Amino acid sequence: MTIELFKNQKHVFWTALLLTIFIFSAGILLGFLIENWRTSKIASLYQQSELDLLDIRIQNDIYSLSEIDCTKVIEENINFADRVFEDAKLLEKYSESSRLSNSIILQHKKYDLLRTSFWINSIKLKERCKTDYHNVVYIYDYQNPSLETEAKQDVFSKLLLELKDKKGNKIMLIPIAGDNNIISVDILMNAYGIKKEELPIILIDEKIKITNVENIEEIEKYLD
């Protein structure tokens, strides 16, 4: 009787162990597949970013020409801004769900370069064509935000999304990571007196810096 009981207990133990190993292995496999799916989505976005970077460099050359149709150029700039904005939302969605590997950080830098180039083009276009849109540049801490900074950035992001939905083409919303050690971004931050320890920060029309905000009205008052 005792031997049978021992055998049964041993059988239960091995069954439970095998079941645990199976569930654990299945969990790892599922996590691996999900991570691969996210990474492939991010890679797809960055392949498009390569084309966009080339496109925006050509746009920059076009703006230097003596004769351009401001109406058409402004329209295309707005369309490009909308695409960059939508891609930025997708990128953040996939990046937040993935581990910040060196590969993902490197790929994120490509989009930061794209957005920075777009920002410069938007400045030039405003000067050249006397446009009435506002550049709203959101510079944030990407790699190592503290819990306090992360919470603050969540508030900033939600308010800026709400502002973009409300203002539409009246603003060029340009999110850029300020801590990715990109020389061009660092130069611009220095030019506008923005320090990394101040992040996150909202820069409006290269003049107004906002470091604390609780509602969109506090941003809108600078857009009227």
Give the predicted meaning of each segment.
Residues Y138-Y142, G168-I183:
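Thiol-based oxidoreductase modules, predominantly thioredoxin-like and allied folds used
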Residues E214-D224:
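Thiol-/selenol-based redox modules, centered on thioredoxin-like
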Residues W119, D165-G168, G193, D224:
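Sec-exported extracytoplasmic/periplasmic mature domains
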Residues T131-Y133, D154-P175:
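Conserved helix-turn-beta segment immediately C-terminal to the redox Cys motif
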Residues D186-G193, V213:
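C-terminal regions of proteins
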Residues Q143-L147, N181, K209:
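Short acidic, S/G/P-rich loop/turn micro-motifs used as interaction or catalytic elements
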Residues E197-V213:
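A short, hydrophobic beta-strand/beta-hairpin element that forms part of a small beta-sheet core
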Residues M1-N135, P145, T149-K152, L161:
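Non-globular targeting/processing and membrane-anchoring segments
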